[in-house]
Curated annotation (Swiss-Prot):
UniProt topology in membrane: Multi-pass membrane protein
Subcellular location, principal: membrane
GO cellular component terms attached to this protein's record: plasma membrane
Subcellular location: Membrane
The UniProt record lists the keyword Transmembrane helix: yes
Annotated disulfide bonds: none
Name of the featured protein: RH-like protein IC
Family assignment from sequence similarity: Belongs to the ammonium transporter (TC 2.A.49) family. Rh subfamily.
PANTHER family attached to this UniProt entry: AMMONIUM TRANSPORTER, RH-LIKE PROTEIN IC
UniProt GO BP: ammonium homeostasis; ammonium transmembrane transport
Biological classification of the source: Eukaryota, Metazoa, Chordata, Craniata, Vertebrata
Function: May be part of an oligomeric complex which is likely to have a transport or channel function in the erythrocyte membrane.
GO molecular function: ammonium channel activity
Length: 417
């Protein structure tokens, strides 16, 4: 039996991270340059504000959203920032290399930084399913593989189906969620007694997680509209996301109270359920021209999120062998699928309304894009899970899952650290 004492990454982490950072610096030196075009000041400020909103979502929103565990709050916040910083650098280079043929110098613009931040956000969503199981060295591997897989998926879908930037990211939620769940399925499962002790929600960390939720709630409209070019589509995306988020908040709080025998509200459900409308409407937010449809989507999404939080964890743990600590499956993958179905229905209605007889073709194309995204997510997730199980990464023992003391310096350490 392997030792339960934590495995030190003192040599492995600095060597891996700093070598990778040096390689990225060299790549930026030889293959990138800034955009030399003269943008108008108003457009530059507006573009920067959207990028700033995305960064706040990633660093504060997702960072604190996963910090509710009693003994794993420090790692959740800091590891998310580490993955964001690394993921943005790699995504800028990768997107630049994949978007031009033959390859040449990568032109860095505010839009490319925005796109790279969204790619890094995919990693933060996926990491919610594995935080507590892995160390920083393993997360470095996960960042590199997932950003590469997402960039490849976008390039393949763009070349096959001739879609724009926004449509390339419509499968973002489904890809990130199923990638993360697949990786979690490959990792060793936590010991039952350790899980009961450490995988618990504490009051103060839970309040911090709610703070992350509030930041995400405020900036989600910017996220859904970040890659849209048309002013009308951007306006629709912002309005519809706000309506869907508002309804999902009311639904989440009401149904959470209904689901409890004494009518009490579960704060754990609130962390994700109040965001359900933003996830569900993300794929089709630019197509919806009336607020009532966005509100219906927010209502359905809130019901799915609360219902999933109450009923699905046992099924995932027992049947699928997935310990989904951050409720990734029913808060992103199921709601992402709801958004995909809504998009297909809206596209069919638009095609019929325009008198176009290509309804079957449109359904086939949309279904093909979704199937391809799922296939790449699961395949790359399996590859990542197998890589993370290699002993060279010095993964934490199952007895040390969900424990900040494995990674952080504390004034008074417990015995065994």
């Amino acid at each position: 039996m392997s030792s339960k004492y934590p495995r030190s990454v003192r040599c492995c982490l600095p060597l891996c991270a700093l070598t990778l950072e040096a390689a990225l610096i060299l790549l930026f030196y030889f293959f990138t340059h800034y955009d030399a075009s003269l943008e108008d000041q108003k457009g530059l400020v507006a573009s920067y504000q959207v990028g700033q909103d995305l960064t706040v979502m990633a660093a504060i929103g997702f960072g604190f959203l996963t910090s509710s565990f009693r003994r794993h709050s420090w790692s959740s916040v800091a590891f998310n920032l580490f993955m964001l910083a690394l993921g943005v650098q790699w995504a800028i280079l990768l997107d630049g290399f994949l978007s031009q043929f033959p390859p040449g110098k990568v032109v860095i613009t505010l839009f490319s930084i925005r796109l790279a931040t969204m790619s890094a956000l995919s990693v933060l969503i996926s990491a919610g399913a594995v935080l507590g199981y892995v160390n920083l060295v393993q997360l470095v591997v996960m960042v590199l593989v997932e950003v590469t897989a997402l960039g490849t998926m976008r390039m393949v879908i763009s070349n096959i189906f001739n879609t724009d930037y926004h449509m390339n990211m419509t499968h973002f939620y489904v890809f990130a969620a199923y990638f993360g769940v697949t990786v979690a399925w490959c990792l060793p499962k936590p010991l039952p007694d350790i899980k009961e002790d450490k995988d618990q929600i504490a009051t103060i960390p839970s309040l911090s997680a709610m703070l992350g939720t509030l930041f995400l709630w405020m900036f989600w409209p910017s996220f859904n509209s970040a890659l849209l070019r048309s002013p009308i589509e951007r306006k629709n995306a912002v309005f519809n996301t706000y309506y869907a988020l508002a309804v999902s908040v009311v639904t989440a709080i009401s149904v959470s109270s209904l689901a409890h025998p004494q009518g009490k509200i579960n704060m754990t459900y609130m962390h994700n359920a109040v965001l359900a409308g933003g996830v569900a409407v993300g794929t089709s937010c630019h197509l919806i021209t009336s607020p009532w449809l966005a509100m219906v989507l927010g209502l359905v999404a809130g019901l799915i999120s609360i219902g999933g939080a109450k009923c699905l964890p046992g099924c995932c743990n027992r049947v699928l062998g997935i310990h989904d600590s951050s409720v990734m499956h029913y808060n992103f993958s199921l709601l992402g699928l709801l958004g995909e179905i809504t998009y297909i229905v809206l596209m069919v209605l638009h095609t019929v309304g325009a008198g176009n007889g290509m309804v079957g073709f449109q359904v086939l194309v949309s279904t093909g894009e979704l199937s391809l995204a799922l296939a790449i997510a699961v395949t790359s997730g399996l590859l990542t899970g197998l890589l993370l199980n290699l002993k060279i990464w010095k993964a934490p023992h199952a007895a040390k899952y969900f424990d900040d003391q494995v990674f952080w310096k504390f004034p008074h350490l417990a015995v065994g650290f």
